[in-house]
Amino acid sequence: MTKSELIEILARRQAHLKSDDVDLAVKSLLEMMGQALSDGDRIEIRGFGSFSLHYRPPRLGRNPKTGESVALPGKHVPHFKPGKELRERVSSVVPVDVADTAD
């Protein structure tokens, strides 16, 4: 689902709201979440999950074209941890083929 699809679905479900208002609300929510993460804050949405930053330490990478070793600096990356309710909903809906997950 894309952001545009989310806005469209929400606008249809909440017919009393203008599409522009739904658009503004979704964009504002995402902007606030991005700002909170960039400030180093953790975001927790009960029943859905939490967003936080994880630190990736410096490492030695490789240039895929030349094969040359490249020193990559450490960095913070966004991380999402699904909540228990979301994990249960997904596991009960999406069938897992054990043969596909085995190596």
From Swiss-Prot:
Keyword Transcription: yes
Region called Disordered, residue ranges: 62-81
InterPro entries: Hist_DNA-bd, Histone-like_DNA-bd_CS, IHF-like_DNA-bd_dom_sf, IHF_beta
Annotated S-S bridges: none
Domain of life: Bacteria
SUPFAM superfamilies with a match to the protein in the record: IHF-like DNA-binding proteins
Keywords of this entry: DNA recombination, DNA-binding, Transcription, Transcription regulation, Translation regulation
Example of a GO cellular component annotation carried by this entry: cytosol
CDD domains reported for this sequence: IHF_B
GO biological process: DNA recombination; regulation of DNA-templated transcription; regulation of translation
Gene Ontology MF annotations: DNA binding; structural constituent of chromatin
Coiled-coil region list: none
Keyword Transcription regulation included in the entry's annotation: yes
Function description: This protein is one of the two subunits of integration host factor, a specific DNA-binding protein that functions in genetic recombination as well as in transcriptional and translational control.
Subunit: Heterodimer of an alpha and a beta chain.
Family: Belongs to the bacterial histone-like protein family.
Protein name (record): Integration host factor subunit beta
Species annotation: Xanthomonas axonopodis pv. citri (strain 306)
UniProt lineage: Bacteria, Pseudomonadati, Pseudomonadota, Gammaproteobacteria, Lysobacterales
Gene encoding the protein: ihfB
